[in-house]
């Protein structure tokens, strides 16, 4: 293919998830695209799930990574949003609907950053950010502030927006009691974002060794969960909870910590995308239960 972009990367070659050096070619830069030289790509738990086939059969070789920060080195002739030399970030989407008013992630034409069928790509699928370069539709890249390093910006492109979007939609206000369940990559972002909105944050973790760090993020209280049933002691404490736990667990005790008619948002993605719910557990709490997937481009730039 003419004008393809020679790229070095780390790719998974099978469901072991082990990544190894690999060289491949990306599609050419088209009129609405930009080419980014990648300076930092952070690791998301999604990378592990997908490369190990936890979310379904994969095509290999596959380059993971959807938390990407770098410098624009080429722009298509129609691009006005970016110029060569700009700092840019790419998250979980690289192409698709450009008129979806902040809901691009829910459009059926959306091309996610790696592992998705794409006839324009020489490898037949999109390839992610554990690589030297990436070609992306300009709409699906964001400007990065000059004062933020590539390393610090990269995790915001998935972990950040995945928690920012539902917290903003929940209209968190000063003094609201917000719970964050699961304090990993997403959870620590959720704590910081909720604190920045003036919320009283209650963090729920199974890892006692994280308590000091979580308090440092600004959480009012850290609850170490040894037995989920102990959570009923905190029933009705919260106005809102965001849950980032990425595996099967007892959900009802966590939901019970939210006040009746409050909201519980699930952003964790367990193996097989499946969770087990107790209907009576939800009914007894009368909590509004919903889920959220990353965020749109407008709110990503806002974040």
Locate the predicted segments by residue.
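Short glycine-/small-residue-rich Rossmann-like dinucleotide-binding loops
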Residues: 42, 76, 93, 227, ...
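Glycine-rich phosphate-binding loop and adjacent beta-alpha segment
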Residues: 197, 245-303
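NAD(P)H dinucleotide-binding glycine-rich loop of Rossmann-like/cofactor-binding domains
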Residues: 96-181
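Adenosine-nucleotide cofactor-binding segment
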Residues: 174-183, 193-253
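Glycine-rich beta-strand-centered segment in the early N-terminal region that forms part
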Residues: 25-41, 54-101, 143-148
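N-terminal Rossmann-fold NAD(P) dinucleotide-binding loop
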Residues: 187-188
């Amino acid at each position: 293919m003419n004008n393809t972009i020679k790229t070095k990367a780390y790719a998974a070659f099978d469901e072991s998830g082990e990544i190894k050096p690999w060289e491949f070619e990306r599609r050419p830069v088209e009129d609405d695209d930009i080419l980014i030289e990648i300076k930092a790509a952070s690791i998301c738990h999604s990378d592990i799930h997908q490369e190990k086939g936890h979310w379904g059969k994969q095509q290999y070789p596959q380059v993971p990574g959807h938390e990407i920060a770098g410098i624009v080195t080429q722009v298509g002739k129609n691009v006005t949003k970016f110029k060569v030399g700009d700092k840019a970030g790419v998250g979980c989407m690289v192409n698709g609907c450009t008129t979806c008013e902040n809901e691009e992630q829910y459009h059926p034409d959306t091309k996610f950053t790696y592992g998705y069928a794409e006839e324009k790509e020489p490898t037949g699928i999109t390839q992610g950010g554990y690589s030297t370069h990436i070609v992306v539709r300009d709409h699906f890249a964001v400007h990065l502030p000059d004062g933020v390093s590539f390393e610090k910006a990269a995790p915001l492109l998935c972990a950040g927006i995945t928690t920012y979007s539902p917290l903003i939609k929940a209209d968190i206000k000063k003094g609201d009691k917000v719970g964050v369940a699961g304090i990993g990559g997403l959870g620590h972002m959720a704590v910081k974002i909720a604190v920045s909105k003036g919320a009283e944050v209650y963090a729920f973790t199974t890892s006692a060794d994280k308590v000091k760090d979580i308090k440092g993020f600004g959480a009012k209280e850290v609850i170490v969960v040894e037995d989920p049933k102990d959570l009923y002691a905190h029933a009705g404490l919260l106005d809102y909870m965001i849950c980032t736990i990425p595996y099967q667990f007892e959900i009802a005790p966590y939901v019970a910590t939210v006040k009746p008619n409050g909201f519980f948002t699930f952003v964790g993605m367990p193996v097989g995308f499946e969770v087990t719910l107790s209907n009576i557990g939800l009914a007894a709490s009368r909590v509004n239960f919903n889920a959220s997937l990353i965020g749109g481009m407008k709110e990503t730039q806002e974040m």
